């Protein structure tokens, strides 16, 4: 299904009505959709470095002169995409029993579980949340593979 650029833009911004979004999800994808989505994101953000891959709503892998880096929507650079960007983020470890997220009867015990919130050090955008056992290392969500990388 060939989409108009306006529809792709609205889809990226969450402004497309739900029924149309579902229709698009169910339909076969046009072969150049990924490139078109990257072009729209590139235009929207206005960066000179090309976007290689959106990691999530506010994080992207971009190609720089120093290699591929993770970059926040605000422009902040994290480290090389092969390192866990969370190690360079601001981390807030929330007490799950503070009552803000869970009622006292549903909250996990803080001796067992921890809620980690990861924020951009430049713009303070919430980038990710993990609910993990105490002492568990940061989760590396995924490591993208790029064809031009040596093995």
Model-found features: residue ranges?
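N-terminal pre-domain and mature-chain start segments
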Residues: 1-115, 119-151
């Amino acid at each position: 299904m060939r989409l108009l650029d306006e529809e792709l833009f609205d889809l990226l911004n969450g402004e497309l009505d739900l029924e149309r979004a579902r229709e698009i999800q169910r339909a076969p994808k046009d072969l150049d959709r990924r490139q078109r989505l990257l072009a729209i994101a590139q235009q929207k953000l206005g960066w000179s470095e090309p976007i290689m891959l959106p990691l999530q709503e506010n994080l992207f892998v971009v190609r720089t002169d120093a290699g591929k880096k993770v970059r926040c929507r605000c422009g902040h650079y994290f480290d090389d995409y092969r390192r866990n960007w969370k190690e360079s983020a601001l981390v807030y470890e929330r007490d799950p029993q503070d009552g803000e997220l869970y009622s006292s009867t549903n909250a996990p015990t803080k001796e067992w579980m921890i809620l980690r919130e990861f924020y951009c050090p430049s713009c303070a955008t919430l980038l990710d949340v993990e609910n993990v056992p105490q002492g568990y290392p940061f989760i590396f969500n995924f490591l993208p593979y790029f064809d031009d990388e040596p093995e």
